[in-house]
Amino acid sequence: SGLGWTVTSADILFVQRLLLDLDLGPHVRMSGEVLWAGERAPEEAKTPETTDRELAQSRVISAGGSGLYPLDMVVSCDITGLERTEPFPAPFVTMSFDLETSIADNTILCAAAIVDRGGHRTEYPITGAETEILEKLTEVVRTEDPDFITGYNIDNFDLPRMEERSEDISPNSESDRAPLLGWGRVPMSESEIKKGWRRPGRIFPNREQNRVWTIKGRIPLDAWWQARQTLRPQRESLKYVSKLLWPDDEEMHKMDIDASKMDEEWATRPDEVLEYCVRDTALPLDILDNLKSIARKEALASVSLTTVDIAATSTTSRWIDSLVIRLADREGVAVPNTNQGPRKQGKIAGGYVHEVDPGVEP
């Protein structure tokens, strides 16, 4: 500003700037070069070059990536190969997980994961030493590559407990901790594992200052929070919510295990506890299906022209910003910087949205 320049729109993240500049939403048609094709990739994408892991990793790094990402496909393209397309129901993959832990010392006794891929569910009941349980869960995440990760109250219990236990097992080495909690959709490489400024490496789940968990490339979607927002239940326990949704279906209710005496239950009937864990893993998937939570997030992203991640985890202001900034750009109106970032500027005077009423207005 001392030279007579006023900088605007300078604090919009590049990934958002791409959507804004090209007027893209969550549904995109793209054309480019296939760098990697995994087992689940379309057959026409598979060649000796695209299925060779070492060669694919080298090609991804040459294109600007950090290594071989745990994805079905990696495609390189430039902005000329991107365009908005008509909305379609994306074939999202969802993984639900649950932990059963010791009351005495907080250790993980057993776990379960269920992956829903197009309506077909694969169960992973997991037992063994605590390190083996965490490693197996991470293997499931990186092999099955889910878009959404759910469970019941994972924001406040399961994810914090896994972070705590992984740090207790490997307190001094991020590289040793990565196989225990490397859930991010990034390569398990040194650059992705090392700590950033005031935050863990990109490969690890991270709880932001607003208490929301982020997992790079994936979307945590707590079924507890979705039920709370949509149903407004009198009580928020999984037992109560499942009976509220399916009052006459015993198969959809929690099993009779006393979680307050989990050490005793695990010692006397471990098979029943594991079955209880699997049931508690399946119910969040059923809750999300019943509430149409994922379809709602995708529809919101399509209308607001944001990523599904922002539609699922962010606030009303981000959705409205996506539309208003495009309008400002079309009309030649400068968008001032906010007071965020390393060099805070003057605060923007204005209003904020209390509530958005659904409906169509003329």
Residue ranges of predicted features:
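Active-site-proximal helix-loop-helix substrate-binding element of RNase H-like nuclease domains
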Residues: R121, D145, I149, L159, ...
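A short acidic (Asp/Glu
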Residues: N106-I108, I154, L159-R165
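Extended, Lys/Arg-enriched charged tracts that mediate electrostatic binding to polyanionic substrates
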Residues: V60-S62, S66-P91, M95-F97, M188-W213, ...
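Acidic beta-strand-to-loop metal/phosphate-binding motif
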Residues: S1, P146-D155
